[in-house]
Amino acid sequence: MQSSAVFSLSPSLPLLKPRRLSLRHHPITTAASSSDLNVSPNVVSIPSLSRRSWRLASSDSPLRAWSGVPSPISHSLDTNRFRTAATAVPESAEEGDNSGKLTKVLELGLLFAMWYLFNIYFNIYNKQVLKALHAPMTVTLVQFAVGSVLITIMWVLNLYKRPKISGAQLAAILPLAVVHTLGNLFTNMSLGKVSVSFTHTIKAMEPFFSVLLSAMFLGEKPTPWVLGAIVPIVGGVALASISEVSFNWAGFSSAMASNLTNQSRNVLSKKVMVKKDDSLDNITLFSIITLMSLVLMAPVTFFTEGIKFTPSYIQSAGVNVKQIYTKSLIAALCFHAYQQVSYMILARVSPVTHSVGNCVKRVVVIVSSVIFFKTPVSPVNAFGTGIALAGVFLYSRVKGIKPKPKTA
């Protein structure tokens, strides 16, 4: 359209009367591109003026008569305008979805960082307390006691919903509480005898016991992929054990017993089939098990080790009372916190992802303990540990693979 074009009435049309234009509530809308307007060289469509087509007279074109037929070009402009407005909403929604996904990823990353950090602090402070007191039962009892206090506070302040548990549910949970108590006790016994890195290397054997117990009591036949992943785990632990500087049979056997009891808990949870409802999620179940473990552990500790957590006994052992109390409290808080966070992560990711994260956690704990305690590690020991952890990672990836059904 030429810039010299103007609206005019030709003198050769005396009977043509100009029409009065009605511009009520009709703003002229311009599009972002010429393709939306469909502009021809001498025609501009203005949809707001009663959908009529106006001809513009330029210096080289005569004035033509008005047309009363609605312009299809104008209708196309309206359609394009409404289509553009409609597509703006999904774009906003997509931006909101992306923002929500980013928030969830950051939240999950923070939970994983907390999970690893609590594990590092627990193992370091727990090892220091066990090395000073030589009382694994007392230390285990303190950890259950601190956890029970935290659970009680959560329920009293209504920070977490207090469950309504029936007698039948308590009876079903009791075996889980027994093996949970034994598992933590055996872990502390091992940490008191050998290095943190060696204890966690032995605990990498958990998949072996899981496969063994599941086959014995649940009738679950392992796939060739799972059996293939078990081989480097067993071989790596054996290689690390024969080259471990702090090796002793008490520490090795305790760690193995911890593997057996912890995996027995998993098998029992499937065998017993605890009925879960809205009031009995994983965190609530863990809380109930912790309270029951305290009740189970208290009499056994008093009859075997006596009361060894008093200031007088600690002083007689030549240990700083304040340091022992502080480190014991931090270790117990971290012990309870990392298990709570672990269940929070499990509620957000798949079991396979959680297993991979648990494998990485073990690597982080081993490396951090070696650095902190300056544990001597031979090349053979490091190689064996690496092979075992690689096997655990492989197991976590292949255990969900189901064999293809045989076709007739």
Swiss-Prot record:
GO terms for cellular component: chloroplast; chloroplast envelope; chloroplast membrane; plastid; plastid inner membrane. Keywords: Acetylation, Chloroplast, Membrane, Plastid, Pyruvate, Sugar transport, Transit peptide, Transmembrane, Transmembrane helix, Transport. It is found in: Plastid, Chloroplast membrane. It comes from the Eukaryota. The modification N-acetylalanine is found at residue 86. The chain crosses the membrane at residues 105-125, 137-157, 165-185, 198-218, 222-242, 283-303, 324-346, 377-396. Residues 124-241 form the EamA domain. Disruption phenotype: Reticulate leaf phenotype. Reduced number of leaf palisade mesophyll cells and increased bundle sheath cells. Small chloroplasts in mesophyll cells. Reduced photosynthetic electron transport rate. Under-expression of CAB3 protein. Reduced levels of aromatic amino acids and phenolic compounds derived from shikimate pathway. Expressed in root columella, lateral root cap and root vasculature tissue. In leaves, highly expressed in xylem parenchyma cells. In flowers, expressed in sepals, petals, filaments of the stamens, anthers and stigma. It is a multi-pass membrane protein. InterPro entries: Sugar_P_trans_dom, Tpt_PEP_transl, TPT_transporter. GO terms for molecular function: phosphoenolpyruvate:phosphate antiporter activity; phosphoglycerate transmembrane transporter activity. GO terms for biological process: phosphoenolpyruvate transport; phosphoglycerate transmembrane transport. SUPFAM superfamilies: Multidrug resistance efflux transporter EmrE. Residues 1-85 form a transit peptide. It holds the Pfam family TPT. Belongs to the TPT transporter family. PPT (TC 2.A.7.9) subfamily. Phosphoenolpyruvate/phosphate translocator that transports phosphoenolpyruvate (PEP), 2-phosphoglycerate, 3-phosphoglycerate and dihydroxyacetone phosphate. Imports PEP to the chloroplast stroma as one substrate of the shikimate pathway, from which aromatic amino acids and a variety of secondary products derive. Required for correct leaf mesophyll cell development and expression of chlorophyll a/b binding protein 3 (CAB3). This is Phosphoenolpyruvate/phosphate translocator 1, chloroplastic.
